[in-house]
Amino acid sequence: MRKLKKKKEKIGIVISNKMKKTIIISETKRIKHPYYKKVILKKKKYYVHDEHNISNEGDLVKIIETRPLSKQKFWRLLKIVKKK
C-alpha cells in the first residue's frame, strides 16, 4: 500500500497576474551563511494556477503543491491571506 505524502504549502506575495488563470508569486527566505554568519535573503518565483483570477498584485497568498499543470506550473492557489 502506498503512503500518501502531505502536500507542501508555501506563502508568498503576488508579483504578476497578467496571464490568464496564472499568477507569479515570490517567496523570500532568510538564511544564515554557514561560515560568514550573515543573514542572506533568497527569493524564488513560483508559477501558480489561479482558476478564477481572484488575486491581484501585492496580495499575500497561500499555495499548495499539485500535479503538473503545465511546463512551469506545479502549484495551485489555496487562499488569499491578505489583500493589498
Curated annotation (Swiss-Prot):
Recorded name of the encoding gene: rpsQ
Question: How is this protein named in the record?
Answer: Small ribosomal subunit protein uS17
Keywords, ordered alphabetically: Ribonucleoprotein, Ribosomal protein, RNA-binding, rRNA-binding
* Any Gene Ontology biological process: translation
Q: Which CDD domains match?
A: Ribosomal_uS17
**GO cellular component: a single term:** cytosolic small ribosomal subunit
Which domain of life does this protein belong to? Bacteria
Q: How does it assemble?
A: Part of the 30S ribosomal subunit.
The organism encoding this protein is Karelsulcia muelleri (strain GWSS) (Sulcia muelleri)
The record's listing under Gene3D superfamilies reads: Nucleic acid-binding proteins
